[in-house]
Amino acid sequence: MKNFSIKITRIAITLILVLLGIIAIFKAWVFYTESPWTRDAKFTADVVAIAPDVTGLLTDVPLVDNQLVKKGQVLLVIDQPRYQQALAEANADVAYYQTLAAEKRREAGRRVRLGVQAMSQEEIDQANNVLQTVEHQLAKAVATRELAKLDLERTTVRAPADGWITNLNVHAGEYITRGSVAVALVKKNSFYILAYLEETKLNGLNKGDRAEITPLGSNRIMHGTVDSVAAAVNNSSSTVNSKGLASIDSNLEWVRLAQRVPVKILLDDKDQLHPYPAGTTATVVITGKNDRATDSGSPFVRLMHRLREFG
């Protein structure tokens, strides 16, 4: 009888342990698959493609790659003598047409004063027409001069904002064309996170929720706030054929891959001071309305938080 009781006790303990193991595995699976977190997150920043608005030789590139620059700082200088000469020519044209217009204005005024007793009405009208033509040429010359001034001003390319110069691939002496990208400027204080959360993890996610960001291969924990969720993503299962009809890819009903949706997370100000390079990877955990305290939660929850941040 005693042996039977011991046997029953062992079986009961075994069943209880198995049941607890199943519950733990189930909770871990739910926690892993449904809680709002992802390892697929990228540091992102506003990047300005710096391209000149004029064409010519680069005469000065006072930069080094990955340099921090201030708004208004000179980035590129392009062939100023050529554009200074163009402005001088435009000024000369304006001066010429101003003199010519003054002369034609006096001549037309004299003919009007003399009137038809001294000359024909046709000659008077002809003088007025010549004056109008010269005045139009003067207006065109003035407009050309203003464009020459603008071109000369734009031979000096300046930083549109504070930020870091990166991927500098031009040097003094090279010929650069209008609109060709010379360098990229990563705006300071513009860093944010794009966290690609599976659609199954978006339930309950709200603007203003707090987030923890752990860069790949780092123990540093950064913080941010959910700003927005993408309003749409590309539907890879549907295209439009040549007749305008939808073409739907075949899909196995028992195999459905969750679509990833970009969630924009704004970094806290203190983390903007020392951001990771744009394009690098991070793990993101949405903690709800408040930041997660390091000593809060059950040991199981804390363990799961730690495990999923390896990456």
Swiss-Prot record:
* One GO MF term attached to the UniProt entry: transmembrane transporter activity
Parts of the chain that traverse the membrane: 11-31
Annotated GO biological processes are: response to toxic substance
Task: Supply the alphabetized keyword list.
Answer: Cell inner membrane, Cell membrane, Membrane, Transmembrane, Transmembrane helix, Transport
- Signal peptide feature range: none
Q: Which InterPro entries does the annotation name? A: CusB-like_dom_1, CusB_D23, MFP_Efflux_Pump, PHBA_efflux_pump_AaeA, RND_pump_MFP
Q: Which domain of life is it from?
A: Bacteria
Q: Per the record, a Pfam family? A: HlyD_D23
Write down the membrane topology. Answer: Single-pass membrane protein
Q: Where in the cell is it found?
A: Cell inner membrane
GO cellular component terms, semicolon-separated: plasma membrane
Coiled-coil residue windows: none
The answer, when asked if Zinc-finger is one of the entry's keywords, is no
**Function of the protein:** Forms an efflux pump with AaeB.
Q: Which HAMAP family match?
A: AaeA
Q: Which family does it belong to?
A: Belongs to the membrane fusion protein (MFP) (TC 8.A.1) family.
The protein in question is named p-hydroxybenzoic acid efflux pump subunit AaeA
This protein's species is: Serratia proteamaculans (strain 568)
